[in-house]
Amino acid sequence: MKHYEFVILFHPNQSERVAEMLERYASQIKEQFSGHVHRVQDLERKKLQYTIKSARTAKAHFAVMNVECSEECIEKMRSNFKFNDAIIRFLIIRRDKAVTDNNPALLEKDEKGSLSKADRQIASQGFTAEDIYLNIAFLREYVLETGRIIPCRAAGVTAKQQRQLSRAIKWARYLSLMPYCDRHR
């Protein structure tokens, strides 16, 4: 069995039912597919960087689940997410190992807009897209005001790190955590 991370955006009108739905999905993974749920993190309602047309809303309720399950389970969960009207968007990411601890970067509200000590440590040690796509304060350091990604020579990162940054920024934009361009602000 492989490790996966689900990022789910629920419609803000369904906020009171989010815990119930997450529990239902977790029990389905455990009972039907003999999977293992390592973490369920409810990130509360957040303002989106742009309005998602299908939901006609600029807010969403975010949740993250880390699971260990089979491909069959992933296909079933993908269809469950796709046909659930309460879910605006979802992202399924394959992880190398289980993630069991709550990520503090997801809960932080960066008011200053500058890199924290932990973010600088991430930048110096190396990173993968799976580790940084929800850390918006870190990703903003590598995006110009026009929305373009800073080239690797100017950013001072290797080509491999640049690919990881690009992938993480793409995922953050899909989840409406970062704007695609300056018109969305």
Please report, for each region that a protein language model flagged, where it lies by residue.
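Structured, basic alpha/beta domains of bacterial-type, RNA-associated proteins
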Residues: 2-3, 7-157, 163-185
